[in-house]
Amino acid sequence: MLRKKTDGFSLPLQKGPFQNNGATPWFCELNIGTPGQTLKFCFDTGSNFNWVTSSLCSDDGCQHYANGRFMFSESSTFEWIDQTGTTVDFGPWGSMEVEEGRDKLCMPIQKELDACLFISLYLSKKYSGIQFDELDWDGGIGLPSGEVSEVPLDKLSGTFRLAQSHEGEPTHSHFLLDLMDKGFVSKKRPFISFLSDMSEDKSARGTVSFGLLDDAYSTSLEYLFLPWARYREEVPYLWSSENASISVGDNLIGEDLYFTLDSGSSAFKGDKTVLKKVFEQTTETSPVVSISLTDSAGDEYGLLEITSDVYRRDIEEGQHKGQSVSQFQWLKGAEDMLLVGSVLMDHLYTVYEYEEPSDGQLVPKGVWIFNKPGGSKIIQTKQKEPASLFDKLKAK
């Protein structure tokens, strides 16, 4: 167990085959339970709960590509919280029947040294569907913006990955806040970042960092800051920014959208009317898709240009294997949403930033995105000064 306080740490990410289910192929191998059982977890900024495929599932149930499950009865540190059972919404994927428990999760943050937390999480006992079949990981760790919905449980949206208690409280404590409370991450460094190396797909590697920043981007002028804005009262935990529009070539397709970066997803998803049109216009031809971001005064502060080599992906396993598919998917009930995950994030350095914690709470500040040196020039806007994000490190 790591005892010395640290500024932060990084964890290696591995990439599974790209599948057409809308979920990221990236995962981190973590140990859960005592003795530790190694399973594949996604660090998911598009959900507000923790979960794992478990031995509650029948022998032929909970089929998924990663094919791991937590054998909770073999862990001496596992504790039940609630065995009455509940249903967790996975949006268009359907739902998952779960029970709730608590156990030790250990992360390899240094050679031969682990950081361990006791976390609450849902143990799945039933799920089904083609999307789950194609899932490259065994469970997820939610990294929400920190906002909590005040909408009654029975009024919550069925479009996004979310869970909430009947009292309107967060179902599970915030993972980053837990890391801070244990001294694994400095409270002066309230950020989470994702960076992947796609130079050789077969050996693709990535990194998720808590409290640490990549200094290679400290002098970059090719970046944007996307200030956080609440998409809907019932799903305030999403990392969204308002006033986005999307065009295909010179054709404006949708405006007044909430642009959301979701590390648990892969494809562009959202508003049915908008995303259906974008998909149709990018399937047979290869136009540039552009996303414009404007401030409250209507002035553009950011422009992204996404070429077909970014938005069209070769499907490596599962349904449509061997095909090249435009990664724009529409969701029922996701009006005014433009969400994207690894399809775009693989080409950017992405940092989720909070305000410094106060009274045991985390408040979202926004998301920083940077072009990779030598990579695709997705961000067309060039800034006059380097990102102020790095001032936190200089002030230390």
Labelled PLM ranges:
Residues S292-K396:
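Aspartic protease catalytic domain
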Residues T283-I291:
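Loop/turn-rich, solvent-exposed surfaces of beta-rich toroidal or solenoidal domains
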Residues M1-T38, T86-E99, I130, A216-E255, ...:
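Pepsin-like aspartyl protease folds
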Residues G36, K111-D114, S199-R205, S296-Y301, ...:
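Short, solvent-exposed loop/turn segments that connect beta-strands within catalytic domains
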Residues N20-D136, S290, D295, D299:
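Signature of the N-terminal lobe/flap region of pepsin-like aspartyl proteases
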Residues M1-N21, K111-L252, G366:
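Aspartyl protease catalytic domain
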Residues N48, C57, K126, G146-V148, ...:
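Conserved beta-strand elements of beta-rich interaction domains across eukaryotes
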Residues W26-T77, L105, G140-P144, G158-R161, ...:
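Aspartyl protease active-site motif detector
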